[in-house]
Structures are given as structure tokens and as C-alpha cells.
């Protein structure tokens, strides 16, 4: 979705849990670097990702879902991230290329709102099979979500569906 506060992170977690319950190997990459909420939604906010000089190992939830988020590597989750676009997109790329995800059937990427640097970087550098948009039943929100749908289509990424949340 192009808009914040519509439930993208919550839907990402719910989809990941459902896929894991069906026996799939699932990972969640929290690409919302300036507003990461995935660790809290999985109740792993006190956990920390560990790593070596070569790789970062994601935190695994009780459901067996592998999770990588900036809040799993910073000391305190309420630290402000005051970085420019290139630094943020660099972290997102690192979470894709430098994290040992192992064998996954699905990697769910929780995106920040908008059609800016991070969504563009993700769509250009990660082999995405499709996107699911999350919206709420408000005209202004629908217009903003349409921009994200158009962006995905311009990037030749299939829109698998739209979840209308809070309806």
C-alpha cells in the first residue's frame, strides 16, 4: 500500500503465520526501516539477530518464521533512524543479500508506505513473484494505493490481490 496505518505489517504477519501453519518455510523481511513494527507483532522485540562477519542470522519465531528487522539489530527499538535514502536502501539490500534465510518457500517483505526509494529498491533488486496490497475503504486511501498498484505494474510485478482492511 502507498499509505501508512492501513495494516500492512499486521497483514504481513497474519499471512506469514498462516503459511507457516500450512507447513511452508517462511521468512519476513521488515523493509520499513524508519518505522519497523514486525518484531513487536511477532512478540520478539526483545530478541536480537546474531551474525558473523559474513552473514546475519534472522530471529526465529515460535512458529518457525525467520524474521529480519532493523529493530532486531539496534540496541533500543525507540532509537530514531535519521538516515537519507541511500543508507536506508543499503540496509534493505543488506537484509536481502547478507541475511542467511536458508531454504524458504515464501519471503514476505513488509514495505513502508509510499512509492519512494525503498519500494523501488525492493522491486528492482529482489526477485519478487507478486505483491499483495492492503487498503482501507476510504477514497483518498484508494487513490494512494492505486499509485502503488501502478508502480508494481510498471515494474512488471504481478498484483496478486488487494486486502481491504478495517471494513
Could you say what each language-model-derived stretch is?
Residues 14, 33, 87-91, 147:
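Short amphipathic alpha-helical face segments that pack within enzyme cores
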Residues 22, 40-45, 71, 94-102, ...:
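Conserved, well-folded catalytic cores of nucleic-acid-processing
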Residues 22-77, 89:
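Phosphate-binding loop that captures ATP/GTP phosphates
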Residues 105-167:
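Conserved catalytic-core segment of NTP-binding enzymes
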Residues 72-122:
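Phosphate-binding/switch loop-helix module in NTP-utilizing enzymes
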Residues 4, 30, 38, 68, ...:
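Residue-level signature of catalytic and energy-coupling elements of molecular machines
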Residues 1-30, 149:
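Walker A/P-loop phosphate-binding motif and the immediately C-terminal alpha-helix
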Residues 11, 39-41, 79-81, 120, ...:
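Short acidic, glycine/serine/threonine-rich loops at helix termini
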Amino acid at each position: 500500500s502507498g499509505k501508512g496505518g492501513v495494516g500492512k505489517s499486521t497483514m504481513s504477519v497474519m499471512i506469514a503465520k498462516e503459511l507457516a501453519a500450512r507447513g511452508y518455510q517462511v521468512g519476513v523481511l521488515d523493509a520499513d526501516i524508519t518505522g519497523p513494527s514486525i518484531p513487536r507483532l511477532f512478540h520478539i522485540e526483545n530478541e536480537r539477530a546474531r551474525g558473523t562477519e559474513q552473514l546475519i542470522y534472522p530471529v526465529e519465531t515460535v512458529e518457525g518464521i525467520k524474521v529480519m528487522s532493523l529493530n532486531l539489530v539496534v540496541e533500543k527499538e525507540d532509537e530514531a533512524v535519521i538516515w537519507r535514502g541511500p543508507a536506508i536502501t543499503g540496509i534493505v539490500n543488506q537484509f536481502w543479500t547478507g541475511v542467511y534465510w536458508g531454504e524458504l518457500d515464501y519471503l514476505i517483505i513488509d514495505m513502508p508506505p509510499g512509492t519512494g526509494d525503498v519500494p523501488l529498491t525492493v522491486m528492482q533488486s529482489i526477485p519478487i513473484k507478486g505483491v499483495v496490497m492492503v487498503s482501507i475503504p476510504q477514497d483518498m486511501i484508494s487513490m494512494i494505493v492505486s499509485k502503488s498498484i501502478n508502480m508494481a505494474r510498471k515494474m512488471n510485478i504481478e498484483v496478486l490481490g488487494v486486502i481491504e482492511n478495517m471494513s
